[in-house]
Design a protein with these regions (language model features):
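Short glycine/proline- and aromatic-enriched beta-strand/turn motifs that initiate or cap beta-hairpins
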Residues: 27-79, 244
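Repeated loop/turn-to-beta-strand initiation elements of outer-membrane beta-barrel proteins
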Residues: 54, 93-96, 150, 200-203
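Flexible, solvent-exposed loop segments that connect beta-strands
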Residues: 58-73, 105-133, 167-181, 216-230
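Structural signature of outer-membrane beta-barrel domains
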Residues: 51-55, 103-108, 161-167, 210-214
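Predominantly the C-terminal beta-signal and adjacent terminal strand-loop region
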Residues: 183-185, 193-245
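Residues on the lipid-exposed face of transmembrane beta-strands in outer-membrane beta-barrel proteins
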Residues: 46-50, 82-88, 100-102, 138-144, ...
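Outer-membrane beta-barrel channels and translocator barrels
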Residues: 39, 91, 147-151, 197-199, ...
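Residues that define the transmembrane beta-barrel architecture of outer-membrane proteins
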Residues: 40-42, 76-80, 132-136, 152, ...
Length: 245
């Protein structure tokens, strides 16, 4: 009788352990969201953007001859933007993405140290010039995607861009000391992103480097703080939160 009760108790324990193991296994399994998304050939998205930008500066030979401008330093400045995403699937690993329209509000600062500031032109020994840009852009990227792991995936991308600055001449009439920027810029971009799958959308935080290849300095010998600069190239780090479906 004792052995029979012992066997029944052991059987109950085995059943309870099996049920607990099955429950834990079922709880541990994640639901796969948007399982058919990889079958889409084309899908849309929208991106919310924060950017930090600066100018890569190359001095004009006149800078060495200047006795008034001692130092010109480019500085970082932040901005925001919105973008539409159009993605076409080429293969399980590769996609091509066009970002249009992309609207960026960007700022670039130059700090001047002057030896002989002109009070008549409201100049100071140290003065900063904020250059505002409103950029309409068209970046095109090739994306390389990893395998999907549950509701997560990593991707890398690279490509080119063209940008048109709506504010390049917005303040050209105000002061002699302005630095003018050209309207059109071309550049290259590269970055990395992460797909997080949710029941009705994909959230993709992304970071990219965006470097302009064009000299965007619109040289004007009449501008006091411009003629010591030869070339200006745009440099930007872009953080995006992308919502896709």
């Amino acid at each position: 009788m004792y052995n029979l009760l012992r066997k029944k108790t052991g059987l109950r324990q085995l059943v309870v352990i099996s049920l607990l193991a099955s429950s834990m296994s079922a709880f541990g399994q994640k639901e796969l969201y948007l399982p058919n998304h990889d079958d889409k050939k084309y899908y849309l998205g929208i991106g919310v953007i924060y950017n930090t930008s600066r100018l890569q500066l190359h001095h004009d030979p006149k800078f060495l001859e200047s006795d008034s401008v001692l130092v010109v330093n480019p500085e970082n400045a932040g901005g925001i933007g919105l973008a539409g995403m159009h993605t076409y699937r080429l293969s399980p690993r590769f996609e091509v993405r066009a970002i249009f329209p992309q609207l960026l509000f960007s700022y670039k600062n130059l700090t001047y140290h002057l030896k002989y500031p002109d009070p008549g032109k409201e100049e100071q020994a140290v003065m900063s010039k904020k250059l505002e840009s409103i950029l309409i852009g068209l970046p095109i990227h090739i994306k390389f995607r990893s395998d999907r792991i549950d509701n997560f995936r990593v991707y890398m991308f690279a490509g080119g861009k063209v940008e048109y600055d709506l504010a390049s001449n917005a303040r050209s009439k105000r002061a002699e000391a302005l630095v003018k920027l050209k309207k059109v810029d071309y550049g290259i971009e590269a970055g990395i992103g992460f797909n997080f799958y949710f029941p009705v959308f994909i959230l993709s935080p992304e970071i990219k480097l965006s470097n302009g290849l064009t000299n965007i300095h619109a040289k004007d010998p009449k501008l006091n703080l411009s003629n010591t600069i030869d070339k200006l190239n745009s440099r930007m780090v872009v953080f995006s939160l992308i919502f896709e479906g």
